[in-house]
Amino acid sequence: MNTGKKNFAGALVPLMFAFFAMGFVDMVGTATNYVKAYFALSDTMANFLPSMVFLWFFLLSVPTSLLMNRIGKKKTVLASLVVTVVAMVLPLVSYSYPVMLVSFCFLGIGNTLMQVSLNPLIGCVVNGDRLASTLTFGQFVKAIASFIAPILASWFAVKFGNWMLLYPIFGAVTVIAALYLGFSKIDEPAVEGKTSGFVDCIKMLGDPAVLLLFLGIVAHVGIDVGINTSAPKIIIERLGLPLSEAAIATSVYFLFRPLGCLTGSYILAKCKTWKFFAVSVLLMVLSMIGLFVGKSLMFIYVAIALVGYGNSNIFPMIFSKALLSRPDKDNEMSGLMIMGLIGGTVFPLLMGIASDALGSQIGSVAVISVGVIYLITLAFRFHKSEK
């Protein structure tokens, strides 16, 4: 038994390193605010940056799932880490708006490869009944990287006058993650039978249950990226704080993300998914109310904390349901679900348009609230399916 536990840990630890590297994508919110300030961009122009990241989830998720059928999950994860390193290096070569767009594109491509392949690779290490809690723990590790990014960026900006010192640090960590995983042994089951084509994968969205889960991912990521980018702007608008101080709002969000994931991995092992899903969505509803009416710093922080905790476990709960619904098509299902990360492109663009039109971040909060409303309907569906 000790040998089994050792082998399990030996396979899981490098995967958790990869989850940490996956969290670097959440630096887009912090980076967007600094780039916006430096180049004096409008909300709409600035929000093109996170859109360049999440556009690739829509374009490449299904092709990545097909690539996994050819080269395997582990090699796909390794390829994702290499692309992420390129994204970290580019801004160090030249700091301009076009280069940042290209860097964000590479970050999006790398993260697409990683999200599609890393989650099902976890399924090669753990069995079905532990999948949701293990994926949640992976999200906890990812959230640690998300949490420290804005803190480090603010500290580098104040201490050294250069927030971009974040890039070489994250680049080095990505290299370490790639080397660790590359030298680790993980057994992958062979793909049996005829593999699906691109059209076959897309047709799976014709299943109403699959479509509902896909749209749930769209809403979850839209909320996540939306809060990531808008939280500092809300504080700047209502309290007049400088960006270096307002950026801490993003850290508040990402502090409660790992707390939610850590407690969620335990709770999900003890209770029905729909109950925890419903509680999570309720916290987000309270958060939206707070973000609409909040005028004090502490009140806004509490609202951000609520959505951080509430949104932290939505992804693994939806994703595990999707994988377990079609275990024979886990690669294809993974690709479809990750394609839902297009919400990270759609929501910021709509938020930018709404906030520019209203001249207020109320527009951004309204767009985010649409995603929360959809998750309310999905919570009722979860309840019915688990009766």
Q: Which residues does each PLM region occupy?
A:
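Conserved MFS/SLC helix-loop-helix module at the cytosolic interface between two early adjacent transmembrane helices
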Residues: 59-98
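Central cavity-lining transmembrane alpha-helices of secondary-active solute carriers
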Residues: 51-65, 251-263
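Intracellular juxtamembrane helix-capping segments at the cytosolic ends
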Residues: 113-126, 312-326
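Cytoplasmic helix-loop-helix junction between adjacent transmembrane helices
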Residues: 103-140
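Helix-breaking motifs and short loop linkers at transmembrane-helix boundaries and internal kinks
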Residues: 40, 72, 93-98, 240, ...
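Structural signature of the two symmetry-related core transmembrane helices
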Residues: 76-89, 275-289
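Extracytoplasmic gate region of multi-pass secondary transporters
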Residues: 28-29, 206-251, 258
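Helix-loop-helix hairpin linking two adjacent transmembrane segments in secondary transporters
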Residues: 137-186
